[in-house]
Amino acid sequence: MNNDNHTSTLSGKAVYIVTGATDNMGSIISRRLAEQGKPVVLACRNLEKAEAFADKLKSKTRNSDVQCLLLDLSSFEMVNDFVERVKALNRPVAALINNAGTLPRHSRISPDGYEHTIQVNFLSTVLLSLAIYPLMIEGGRIILSTSISRHLASLPYEFPAVSHFTQIGAYAQSKLALTLFSIYMSTVMKTGRVSVNCVNPGVIKTGVLALHRWLDRAADYLVNPLPDPEAGVIPTMRALESNDTGFIFEGRDKQIKTSTMLKNRDVFIKLCNDTMRIIKKHLPHDATPQ
């Protein structure tokens, strides 16, 4: 899959983008990449917090190639603003690690007219991934964060519209949709030069996965216990090192085909068509899928 000459020429300059890079798992992923000497782009909503974290990383890892760019996934316009900032770096992208996510207790509508959880966790993440794809090196990585909660979800006919909001329901639907759409990205789009994988960090001690319902947390813990964010980043680091595509990485050694989530082909086709109909309106011209 790799073009060795192309990769050897560019990989020294290619950046690793981590979304949600300052909190919990994102900060650990960023630190590990910086420790490896990778050029890291911290993609965050709070630039002041990101700059302070970047200074800390540079000091602790002695890696000066750490920088911050503003990214807010709550609207398509702000996603595209971020992509333009990445282009302005004049550097290729080695990996896009889609770590950012949200789990609000209450529903609200995004500036684009979608439920906020669905916009951030699914639609804007898809837009970001497709817009960054043309900037990536041969052998690049797109990593999408899924959740065990995807097994609790089904996608209603009106999705991505949400007719009835529940906290875990919207979150689970966003993660199921993202997992299924990764099949489209890794196979239907034939993105052979870039691998597309999902990672499931398990239930860990982070704010975003605190479901505020003891039953959900207890059930998840019994299925896939991981005690802290350090353990939760293991699947991401494994996916970064793997040449495989179309997989879900879990824990220290588990790896399953994403296609195992494909239970209803009609639902899958509708999801892909509806999602691309929305996303194509906001994609840069050079990122429009063939």
What are the language-model segments listed below?
Residues 118-129, 143, 174, 225-228:
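Short alpha-helix in the Rossmann-fold core of NAD(P)-dependent oxidoreductases
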Residues 81-88, 105, 112-119:
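Active-site Tyr-X3-Lys motif and surrounding loop/helix of classical short-chain dehydrogenase/reductase
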Residues 47, 68-84:
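The beta1-alpha1 cofactor-binding region of Rossmann-like NAD(H)/NADP(H)-dependent oxidoreductases
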Residues 198, 220-260, 265-269:
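C-terminal helical subdomain
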Residues 120-140, 150, 154, 186-187:
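Amphipathic alpha-helical dimer-interface segment in Rossmann-like NAD(P)H-dependent oxidoreductases
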Residues 19, 93-101, 121, 143-146, ...:
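Rossmann-fold scaffold of SDR-type NAD(P)-dependent oxidoreductases
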Residues 101-109, 115, 141-193, 200-213:
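Catalytic loop of short-chain dehydrogenase/reductase
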Residues 6-44:
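Canonical Rossmann dinucleotide-binding motif of NAD(H)/NADP(H)-dependent dehydrogenases/reductases
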